Amino acid sequence: MLKGSIVALITPMNRDGSVDNASLERLVEFHINQGTDAIVAVGTTGESSTLAQSEHIAVVEQVVSFAAGRIAVIAGNGANATAHGVELTQKLAKTGVDAMLGVTPYYNKPSPKGIIAHYTAIANSTDIAQILYNVPGRTCLDMQPEVIAELAKVSNIIGVKEATGDVSRVAKLRALCGDDFLLYSGDDASAKDFLLLGGDGVISVANNIVPKAFKVMCDAALSGNAELAKIHDDTLRGLYGSLFCEANPIPVKWASHQLGLITNAYIRLPLTELSEQFHGLLLETMKQAQLKV
């Protein structure tokens, strides 16, 4: 199922920097048991930028194997160079994933024409569904609704993860792209309103540690029950902020370790583990979210 409550899954690691497959399997089972609708493996939150391509593919293969058809798996396939994106996409297509999620190229600042050519080339390299990912806070490139609408004409580009936090884009994207084009929020703090305005799902960081509560909030919003959605969203609101007290996924890895979901909070350089000054803040907001820490 490619709608609803989707987790942007962390990639657990051992202290030597290798992938912790035992913890990875626990995470997949945890999300299946908690009712999460789909998993994004090796996206931004999964540290795609610091994994070698062989590691990237291996993690996706493991998640697909652990999932065993019980939950949909979406693989990150973002790349700064189109040729690299095509190569990665063709390799990921052999893993059994249900879809792929590709962030806009970053740093090299392509024009709208370049963005369209980039995503079209990647989509044309496979039959597997592709989801665009717009996150200008990280890429310094804001893919405009008109560009997304042009890409929506490509048969296997099925949706966009919109992480600007601007919920007014929901109506514009729906009008430009049609009812069948999937609209995902990539911003936990505005996700409730995004869904109430007609979005289809949320690809969430907080979902790593509060999947059941986040699923209830999403289901309420998707059904149009604004009052119930607000009640559950309010419980999680402090957590949304504290999970970004340092660069994602630093805080969510630390929180996952505190909950015993992963063996340790190791994160690859140039990111470092959560600064001690933020431990109290995160613990307090975890308690507010009714987590036992």
Swiss-Prot record:
Residue numbers for the site described as Part of a proton relay during catalysis? 44, 107
Sequence positions that bind pyruvate? 45, 203
Q: Which residues form the active site?
A: 133, 161
- Family annotation (InterPro entries): Aldolase_TIM, DapA, DapA-like, Schiff_base-form_aldolases_AS, Schiff_base-form_aldolases_CS
Q: Where the protein is mainly located, per its record?
A: cytoplasm
Coiled-coil intervals in this record? none
Keywords per UniProt:
Amino-acid biosynthesis, Cytoplasm, Diaminopimelate biosynthesis, Lyase, Lysine biosynthesis, Schiff base
Give the matching CDD domains: DHDPS (cd00950)
**Location of the protein in the cell:** Cytoplasm
Q: Which gene encodes it?
A: dapA
User: Annotated Gene Ontology MF terms?
Assistant: 4-hydroxy-tetrahydrodipicolinate synthase activity
Q: Sorted alphabetically, which Pfam families does this protein's record hold?
A: DHDPS
Q: What is this protein identified as?
A: 4-hydroxy-tetrahydrodipicolinate synthase
A GO CC annotation given for this chain: cytosol
EC code(s) of this entry: 4.3.3.7
User: What does the record give as the function of this protein?
Assistant: Catalyzes the condensation of (S)-aspartate-beta-semialdehyde [(S)-ASA] and pyruvate to 4-hydroxy-tetrahydrodipicolinate (HTPA).
Q: S-adenosyl-L-methionine among the record's keywords?
A: no
